Swiss-Prot record:
GO terms for molecular function: DNA binding; serine-type endopeptidase activity. Its EC number is 3.4.21.88. The active site is at S142 (for autocatalytic cleavage activity), K179 (for autocatalytic cleavage activity). Pfam families: LexA_DNA_bind (PF01726), Peptidase_S24 (PF00717). Represses a number of genes involved in the response to DNA damage (SOS response), including recA and lexA. In the presence of single-stranded DNA, RecA interacts with LexA causing an autocatalytic cleavage which disrupts the DNA-binding part of LexA, leading to derepression of the SOS regulon and eventually DNA repair. Keywords: Autocatalytic cleavage, DNA damage, DNA repair, DNA replication, DNA-binding, Hydrolase, Repressor, SOS response, Transcription, Transcription regulation. Belongs to the peptidase S24 family. This is LexA repressor. InterPro entries: LexA (IPR006200), LexA-like (IPR039418), LexA/Signal_pep-like_sf (IPR036286), LexA_DNA-bd_dom (IPR006199), LexA_repressor (IPR050077), Peptidase_S24_LexA (IPR006197), Peptidase_S24_S26A/B/C (IPR015927), WH-like_DNA-bd_sf (IPR036388). It catalyses: Hydrolysis of Ala-|-Gly bond in repressor LexA. The record marks A107, G108 as: Cleavage. GO terms for biological process: DNA repair; DNA replication; negative regulation of DNA-templated transcription; proteolysis; SOS response. The lineage of its organism: Bacteria, Pseudomonadati, Pseudomonadota, Betaproteobacteria, Burkholderiales. Residues 31-51 bind DNA.
Length: 224
């Protein structure tokens, strides 16, 4: 747990919940989810704590989206320091992660093909609960309400498997997209987090692959 003397115990609980949810799902919780998890009477109570955290510089609130919560870089560094112990010395995993930044993906090419790598970034070891394999530059606003907006860098763990409700990187035909996965007995749907965008229904026989799982979100200001 991040020990920040500026925060009340309740604010610390909210901050820990945000960080843990982002590490587990790749997206921050909604106000309603915070209220339900911490036993608040309403989402308004959660909003009051979020506003206090924003005033104290622990988070940034993005208007117009239910998941518009971002951890500031100094908060992330403090969480990392707390995980590493008081000195961080002698930790064999203390070297930074060197991750390729993937830009536009050409049709039919593997995501990690060299021509897609714009540059590499060093990211603090342990910043996320699961080590990502690459960073994917987000284009567009289809995942806005999950707090993922144009220009963000999505931390992705390469995998072919995902559970319902997780945010994935999917290849559908020649296109690569970031969406929330929903599977039923008969269908696969890729859900946007923005009502202005349609649900993508994977048609029978249509080429579809899960390329990766979102394990976190960072911005350029959070990078070393």
């Amino acid at each position: 747990m991040l020990d920040n003397p500026k925060l009340t115990a309740r604010q610390q609980q909210v901050l820990d919940l945000i960080q843990n949810t982002m590490a587990r799902t790749g997206a921050p919780p909604t106000r309603a989810e915070i209220a339900a998890e911490l036993g608040f009477k309403s989402a308004n109570a959660a909003e009051e704590h979020l506003q206090a955290l924003a005033r104290k510089g622990a988070i940034e609130l993005v208007s117009g989206t239910s998941r518009g919560i971002r951890l500031h870089s100094e908060t992330l560094r403090s969480i990392h320091a707390a995980r590493s112990g008081p000195s961080g010395a002698g930790n064999p995993g203390s070297s930074p992660w060197v991750l390729p930044l993937i830009g536009r993906v050409a049709a039919g090419s593997p995501i990690l093909a060299q021509e897609h790598v714009e540059q590499t970034y060093s990211v603090e070891n342990g910043l996320f609960q699961h080590k990502p394999d690459y960073l994917l530059k987000v284009r567009g606003m289809s995942m806005r309400d999950a707090g993922i907006i144009d220009g963000d860098l999505l931390a992705v763990q390469a995998t072919r498997e995902a559970r319902n409700g997780q945010i994935i990187v999917a290849r559908l035909g020649d296109d690569v997209t970031v969406k929330r996965l929903r599977r039923t007995a008969s269908t696969i749907e890729l859900l946007p987090e923005n009502p202005d965008y349609p649900v993508i229904v994977v048609q029978p026989g249509e080429p579809f692959e899960i390329e990766g799982l979102a394990v976190g979100l960072i911005r350029n200001t959070m990078l070393m």
